[in-house]
């Protein structure tokens, strides 16, 4: 167990690290964060990884579905939520999102340092230099000049080698917790475990000795029900909902967990099998394609290695599943949006905490289940049956909350339906919540103009000392 650093030991470790770098040594013995260092040694892999830049479209998910603004009221995701794109944009997008705010210095801003954790091989470098106590300490802006290389080689590979590795110690602890230590895993299993470093549900610890640390809620298992019991047991919440005052859970991107529930996971078809297939270079050399993307874009190298059906057939099946998942998603959202507004009205009419507690528990559980299903972006392919099951329980629990709310509101003298304001667009939904988006956007633009060039200049100066 790592001992907690005192202020003196933290300062000393920082001084040692700075001296080490000034001497012109590598920043880390285990991690080379600069992806371009490997462009000659692993030419095909590097070039295909670089092609993730072609996945450049930014899709505004809140504009597509304004319900989510209300569902995340009081949380950063109500400000800005874009659909994910290629690995090449990981650092760019976390810098640019309104969720990270507009910090003016290293101690400023709304989010913790942990928000860098899935974005860059600079993260394992920093953990190796400073320990987890040093890395997780402080605000997100502290990492601006340090975390500049986007998701790449050293996130998944040992330094200068194709050998796979877990580069973040909290992931090793999570895999141990579910009885699948990386050190004992097969190569096939490791090809999914390295993806599970980021494509998972996680939270930031609130315990004083681990405050801000990333942890996966897997102590009781990886199903939605098991994680829910875990979170309830430690009385954890990500935020308090601005309307209903519910202690909420925000699911992240649990692809690994939902993949395990589906037919591919149960048959141990790895992430790499479908998203990073073996291909042949123009020179006739076989290599793993690092342009992580949709398997249908490389059908012959992915799906066709197992399936006898045509591409058109399988695309059709997948689209049907997506449509069914979307239908259930919207049903859950309709119930949840109404539940939040009805709960707000109940508070307004004088409801007590004791009266509201069972209602808020239902809302918490319903939205957690909705969120876990929709935050797993590939769930319609990975585990459509599980997605529909989970969304079905979300609808039921939200309906339970609304039945209780109807009874409580009647007790308070209100028998008419609670009016739901116009939330038909992102802008209208944000206005209902009183969000000053013009101010937030202006502050973000000023941050990008003032702070980002400084961060990049500091990073360039630091990396110039590397051998």
Swiss-Prot record:
Record-level Gene Ontology MF annotations:
calcium ion binding; heme binding; iron ion binding; nitrite reductase (cytochrome, ammonia-forming) activity
Q: How is the cofactor bound?
A: Binds 1 Ca(2+) ion per monomer. Binds 5 heme c groups covalently per monomer.
The catalytic activity of this protein is classed by the Enzyme Commission as: 1.7.2.2
Asked if Transport is a keyword of the record, the answer is yes
Q: Top-level EC class, please?
A: oxidoreductase
Which of this chain's residues are annotated to bind substrate?
202, 253
Pfam families in the cross-refs:
Cytochrom_C552 (PF02335)
Query: InterPro entries under this entry?
Result: Cyt_c552, Cyt_c_NO2Rdtase_formate-dep, Multihaem_cyt_sf
The residues listed in the UniProt record as binding heme c 4, with positions renumbered to this chain, are: 271, 274-275, 382
SUPFAM superfamilies in the cross-refs: Multiheme cytochromes
> Which reaction(s) does its UniProt entry say it catalyses?
6 Fe(III)-[cytochrome c] + NH4(+) + 2 H2O = 6 Fe(II)-[cytochrome c] + nitrite + 8 H(+)
Pathways per UniProt: Nitrogen metabolism; nitrate reduction (assimilation)
Residues where Ca(2+) binds: 201-202, 250, 252
Name its cellular compartments: Periplasm
Which PANTHER family does the UniProt entry name for this protein? CYTOCHROME C-552 (PTHR30633:SF0), CYTOCHROME C-552 RESPIRATORY NITRITE REDUCTASE (PTHR30633)
Protein name per its UniProtKB record: Cytochrome c-552
Give the organism the record lists. Shewanella oneidensis (strain ATCC 700550 / JCM 31522 / CIP 106686 / LMG 19005 / NCIMB 14063 / MR-1)
């Amino acid at each position: 167990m790592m001992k907690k650093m005192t202020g003196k030991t933290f300062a000393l470790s920082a001084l040692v690290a700075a001296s080490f770098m000034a001497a012109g040594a590598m920043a880390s013995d285990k991690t080379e964060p600069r992806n371009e260092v490997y462009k000659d040694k692993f030419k095909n892999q590097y070039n295909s990884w670089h092609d993730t830049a072609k996945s450049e479209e930014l899709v505004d998910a809140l504009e597509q579905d304004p319900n989510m603004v209300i569902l995340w009221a009081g949380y950063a995701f109500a400000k800005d939520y874009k659909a994910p794109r290629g690995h090449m944009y990981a650092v760019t997008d976390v810098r640019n999102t309104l969720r990270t705010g507009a910090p003016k210095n290293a101690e400023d801003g709304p989010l913790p340092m942990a928000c860098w954790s899935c974005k860059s091989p600079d993260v394992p470098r920093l953990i190796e230099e400073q320990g987890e106590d040093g890395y997780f300490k402080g605000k997100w802006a502290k990492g601006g000049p340090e975390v500049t290389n986007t998701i790449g080689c050293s996130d998944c590979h040992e330094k200068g080698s194709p050998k796979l590795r877990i580069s973040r110690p909290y992931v090793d602890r999570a895999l141990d917790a579910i009885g699948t230590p990386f050190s004992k895993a097969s190569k096939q299993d490791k090809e999914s475990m390295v993806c599970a470093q980021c494509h998972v549900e996680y939270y930031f610890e609130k315990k004083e000795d681990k405050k801000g640390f990333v942890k996966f809620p897997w102590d009781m298992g990886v199903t939605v029900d098991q994680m829910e019991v875990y979170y309830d047991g430690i009385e954890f919440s990500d935020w308090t909902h601005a309307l209903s005052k519910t202690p909420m859970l925000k699911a992240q991107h649990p692809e690994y967990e939902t993949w395990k529930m589906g037919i591919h996971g149960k048959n141990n078809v790895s992430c790499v099998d479908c998203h990073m297939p073996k291909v042949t270079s123009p020179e006739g050399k076989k290599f793993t394609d690092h342009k992580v993307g949709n398997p249908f874009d490389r059908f012959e190298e992915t799906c066709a290695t197992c399936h006898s059906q045509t591409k058109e057939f399988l695309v059709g099946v997948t689209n049907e599943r997506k449509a069914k998942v979307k239908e259930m998603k919207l049903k859950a959202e309709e119930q949840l949006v109404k539940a939040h507004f009805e709960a707000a009205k109940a508070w307004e009419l004088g409801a007590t905490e004791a009266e509201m507690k069972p209602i808020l528990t239902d809302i918490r559980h319903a939205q957690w289940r909705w969120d876990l299903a929709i935050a797993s972006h590939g769930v319609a392919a990975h585990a459509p049956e599980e997605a529909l099951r989970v969304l079905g329980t979300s609808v039921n629990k939200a309906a339970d909350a609304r039945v209780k709310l109807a009874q409580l509101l009647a007790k308070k003298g209100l028998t008419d339906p609670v009016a739901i304001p116009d939330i038909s667009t992102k802008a209208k939904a944000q206005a209902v919540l009183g969000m000053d988006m013009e101010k937030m956007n202006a502050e973000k633009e000023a941050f990008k103009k003032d702070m980002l060039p400084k961060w990049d200049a500091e990073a360039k100066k630091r990396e110039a000392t590397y051998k």
